[in-house]
Amino acid sequence: MPGKTRYDDTLAVILSELSRTWARGKDQSTPEGWQYPDDHFNYTSVILTGGNTAPNRQIGGFDLDPAVKGQAVAILDESGTVVKRVPTAADLVATVCGAFGMKMGTDFFIPGGHGQIQDAITM
């Protein structure tokens, strides 16, 4: 449904990657000794505004303990089940695609699993 202003029809996404993790392993003298972690989006903040975003909401949170990977939120996964887990970058992309009216598994596919973050987008 079209909004009343251009702002209502425009989704702005501000994404900040705040750190990276280093490759680690027991013996890094050979390629087999390396373990490559997911070195992007270790800590990320995201702001969604305009479009179909739900107003005045903070979803998730943070912890100053570097061992904490984020706070679990409700996510509608690919199977249609609502699960509670820490969101990933793929979940953010799926949520943005959902705001554009795209359907998971039909209009787009993200390898490795993803879900739409609940309560971020109003429809």
Language model regions located:
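Feature marks hydrolase-like catalytic cores characterized by long aromatic- and Gly/Pro-rich stretches
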Residues: 1-123
